[in-house]
């Protein structure tokens, strides 16, 4: 029997068997692993053991999320085929089974329709994995805003009202610590013309008519169709598909419906609120930020200890594995296959993930 060797690295490990006909390598990447335990559920020889996920997620201990017994593992590749986050991969003679038509593959995907995208950056702000970057290039400011602003310092009494009301934070006051020889708390006023949008708010609020604003091209002063404002704004939304967990936060929040997400499973997450002890392990481990402690509107309102937004859940099961009181159940009703299993043994193995 050919010996299987396990090499451990800082962010994972590789188990490999080097035979005369073929070389098999099973690689695990800790950075991509979310601790869902799907690999352990599907393993036909029970070679995979999950770590203390709740404690790991909450930062109580530092340990691997899983381990594989190299002497038990048969390098069949079921775990790699079922892993929805590509944390496991089996290579046969250097080729990944994810690229091999003979092996099943779970599908998850995300698409950005750049022609719809308005480059608002909201998707980037909400992504729990930091997998989205909006590359936005603005035209030179002078193409949008042209004008002049003048402050008559003989009329100005340095009251600061203009600075308080300026929506662009373009007016700066120079403050002074009052002394008997120099008692004025404000000694000067300046306009940052790189920030000023010539909206005339300062002119309107000045009680001494000390400010004059001349606007040649000012979007804030009149209604301009959105397309006009965007004429000179270019860019694109970039998704790091290795980091993306297809939670759907981006599509959920997108005001332009420019993002489409395909999740690996359909079903629902069921929480036994009576069993839940509100430890927070599920919240800490969830790669999708789909769980939260609800906040009551007032002291009298009763709320569940924990709630889930089903729209943001990928049904990976990491929360269920981390829960110390077994208060969470994953009910999967459908697997989104890119390639369905053909062999009977593989079909039966994938059935373990259902229900």
From Swiss-Prot:
One of its GO terms (molecular function) is metal ion binding. Its cofactor is [4Fe-4S] cluster. Residues 24-53, 64-93, 108-137, 147-176, 187-216, 235-264, 267-296, 304-333 form the 4Fe-4S ferredoxin-type domain. [4Fe-4S] cluster binds at residues 33, 36, 39, 43, 73, 76, 79, 83, 117, 120, 123, 127, 156, 159, 162, 166, 196, 199, 202, 206, 244, 247, 250, 254, 276, 279, 282, 286, 313, 316, 319, 323. It comes from the Archaea. Binds 8 [4Fe-4S] clusters. Transmembrane segments: none annotated. Keywords: 4Fe-4S, Iron, Iron-sulfur, Metal-binding, Repeat. This is Polyferredoxin protein FwdF. It comes from Methanocaldococcus jannaschii (strain ATCC 43067 / DSM 2661 / JAL-1 / JCM 10045 / NBRC 100440). The gene is fwdF.
